[in-house]
Amino acid sequence: MKEAELNRDVAKFCTDNQCVILQPQGLGPKSAAPMAPRTLRHVQAIVALVVVTVFFSLLALFVVVLQPWRQKQNEDHPVKAGLHGGNYSGSDNCSQFVRRAEMQEAIQSLRASGNSSSCHKEIQTLKYQMDNVSSQVQLLGGHLEEANADIQQAKDVLKGTGALASETQALRSSLEVASADIHSLRGDLEKANAMTSQTQGLLKSSTDNTSAELHVLGRGLEEAQSEIQALRGSLQSSNDLGSRTQNFLQHSMDNISAEIQAMRDGMQRAGEEMTSLKKDLETLTAQIQNANGHLEQTDTQIQGLKAQLKSTSSLNSQIEVVNGKLKDSSRELQTLRRDLSDVSALKSNVQMLQSNLQKAKAEVQSLKTGLEATKTLAAKIQGQQSDLEALQKAVAAHTQGQKTQNQVLQLIMQDWKYFNGKFYYFSRDKKSWHEAENFCVSQGAHLASVTSQEEQAFLVQITNAVDHWIGLTDQGTEGNWRWVDGTPFDYVQSRRFWRKGQPDNWRHGNGEREDCVHLQRMWNDMACGTAYNWVCKKSTDWSVARTDQS
């Protein structure tokens, strides 16, 4: 989090590439906050307009109604006008009674006067004006109702504004809580980043420590990866490379197993040596304790000898003997100390062997992981190889289909005709039976064989009663008819295809027998050297074999 801004109504958070703004719904800078004052001003303006309209309407009504009546009263009754203009100090009720009486007298005088028609017109005019005033009053009443409705709507808007204000306050409190949560989450994120950096440092140090030990294994894995890349590049040799990879891994596992066994033997020998060294150490410890006891005894003896030396000088020889023994004891003590240092060296060797064993176990585990990954990759390669083989088969099938389609188009362009899964060629020139068969074989076909009534009808329709050689002959064995393309000859089914009295094996003047069959609506045997048109038949499998001609 690069930047964060918190206001009373808006929270803004920015990173290196984006910013996020959090604000209560419907409380933008131009939304609900100014709505209440604006609506209030609108209501006040409507109320003022309605009041002014009502005032001026009443004023106009007053002027329109009273002005003609006053003019008429002043013209016809000057006395009564003078009375109105005089000093009258009665009460309001009395004045109203006098005015009513005056109006009644004026109406009676108007009725009695000779200008009754003009008065009637004025009365009609006053009624019309009164109707207009009534309509205006009704309009004003409608406007007043609309104003009341607007005022009620304004009150509702003000109530909604109060609700929005409370909702705004609630959203502000929620925003403050969210801001506190964001600050807390930011602190947690910083802690997580610190822990991540520490973890990365630890991982980096661990990687640096183990990189040297895994260098040899890494080279082996690189070789395996290079072999795998070679496998991916040429899947045709993938099986051989996979077997070599498995042999290599098996050889590596055998070597590692041998090394582990050797390490186990070494550990066993080291354990035995440790046991022996412990026993020697116990023996040396006992000897050291004995030597310490001897030293203490020697010190006691030396103290006694010193005491005796003070008393007599004859003990010098004994002191020298004791000194010699003391030197021997010192030499034995030095020997014991050297043995103790050898024991420490053996302990360090044992610890080194244990460390090497742990490293070997780690390498074995890594090799196992690499072996599993290699096996997984080999399985993937096998799957990819299967997919590739399937794709190659599909491509081969598509290629064969395309090739077949091209051959079909080529045959159609060469006037071959298709019927019931076979292609037939009907020649325009004439050849002998053997020449016609050789031509058909050169085209990958044979002279046509007929195996059904439908095929017979098709050949008859195309040949149109013109003689055409077909692939039936009994050369070699008279009466043993066979199709030249190897199709089995059905004597029973073929009886209906022969002309009446055929085959008759007629001998011609040149001595040649009729050993070949031609089609001219029906079958007939004929001398094979006769020149006829012919019909070739090609199978759609494109694998027609040539038979020997006798």
Curated annotation (Swiss-Prot):
Signal peptide: none annotated. Residues 438-538 form the C-type lectin domain. Gene3D superfamilies: 1.20.5.170, Mannose-Binding Protein A, subunit A. It comes from the Eukaryota. One of its GO terms (molecular function) is glycolipid binding. Residues 1-42 are cytoplasmic. One of its GO terms (biological process) is endocytosis. Kupffer cells. The chain crosses the membrane at residues 43-69. It is a single-pass type II membrane protein. One of its GO terms (cellular component) is plasma membrane. Keywords: Disulfide bond, Endocytosis, Glycoprotein, Lectin, Membrane, Receptor, Signal-anchor, Transmembrane, Transmembrane helix. Disulfide bonds join C440-C536, C516-C528. Glycans are attached at N87, N93, N115, N132, N209, N255. Residues 70-550 are extracellular. It is found in: Membrane. Pfam families: Lectin_C. Its main location: membrane. PROSITE patterns: C_TYPE_LECTIN_1, C_TYPE_LECTIN_2. Receptor with an affinity for galactose and fucose. Could be involved in endocytosis. This is C-type lectin domain family 4 member F. It comes from Rattus norvegicus. The gene is Clec4f.
